[in-house]
A protein has these predicted regions:
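N-terminal intrinsically disordered/low-complexity leader segments
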Residues: 1-9, 200
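Generic hydrophobic, amphipathic alpha-helix propensity
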Residues: 10-18, 35, 60-64, 68, ...
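Helix-turn-helix
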Residues: 13, 20-55, 59
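Short coil/turn segments at alpha/beta junctions that flank glycine-rich nucleotide-binding fingerprints
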Residues: 24-28, 78, 100, 145
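Short alpha-helical scaffolding segments that buttress acidic/His motifs in well-ordered protein cores
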Residues: 56, 89-93, 107-111, 161, ...
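Hydrophobic alpha-helical connector segments
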Residues: 59, 70-103, 154-161, 185
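Amphipathic alpha-helical segments used for helix-helix packing
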Residues: 84-85, 98-122
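Hydrophobic/aromatic-rich alpha-helical bundle segments in the mid-to-C-terminal region
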Residues: 119-125, 129, 143-195, 199-200
Length: 200
């Protein structure tokens, strides 16, 4: 095993531990000492890889966002019509809400902390740019294939679709019973379908 591989393994162990601790205790209550103990490393080694708890939170959310981007790319690749794309948007959003609530809650923590931390603010800005770019590129390819014909420019449409799904996810976090209401998912599908337009 190379030194680089060993380093990556330690860093991943710390990130997994941070994800568990931050999820269970919240950002404010979780401590570096707890995260280091959970990862089975010293505080000194943790700080060798990550400068602060802020950076740990940001990197945990970044890892989740990378997975989100992969879901979005797959969504666009397998959609053959605007109807498909609207349905798949529901599938992706539902997958995140139901399969990875930790990512949802830690993302909210990250958004809150971004108002106080320049480091986290920079990370959040970069992550949202990554998400918008993925959606914009997918929309551009879908339009090129003739499966959608939106009435608004693709850049603003990408931001709008993300705003709608983010807003719903935030409401589901506050009121979990809403996520069990099928009408919410039907409304998301209908709204997305209307925004995407009819392909040729």
């Amino acid at each position: 095993m190379t030194a680089r591989a060993r380093s990556d393994e330690k860093a991943q162990a710390i990130l997994h531990a941070a994800r568990r601790c931050l999820s269970e205790r919240g950002y404010a209550a979780a401590t570096i000492a707890e995260i280091a103990a959970e990862a089975g490393v010293s505080r000194g080694l943790l700080h060798y890889y990550f400068r602060s708890k802020e950076e740990l939170l940001a990197q945990v959310v970044r890892a989740g966002t990378d997975g989100y981007v992969e879901l979005l790319e797959s969504m666009f690749a397998r959609s053959q019509s605007a109807d498909d794309l609207a349905r798949e948007l529901v599938v992706v959003t539902r997958t995140i809400v139901q399969s990875d609530p930790t990512f949802v809650s830690l993302s909210m923590e990250c958004w809150t902390l971004a108002h106080e931390s320049p480091l986290v603010a920079h990370e959040v800005e970069d992550l949202y740019r990554q998400l918008r770019d993925a959606v914009s590129q997918g929309l551009e390819e879908a339009e090129g294939r003739g499966i959608i014909r939106p009435a608004i420019p693709l850049g603003p449409l990408a931001a709008l679709l993300l705003a709608i799904t983010d807003g719903l996810v935030m409401q589901f976090l506050i009121h979990p019973e809403l996520a069990a209401d099928e009408r919410m998912w039907e409304a998301l599908e209908l709204g997305a379908r209307s925004l995407l337009g009819t392909g040729e």
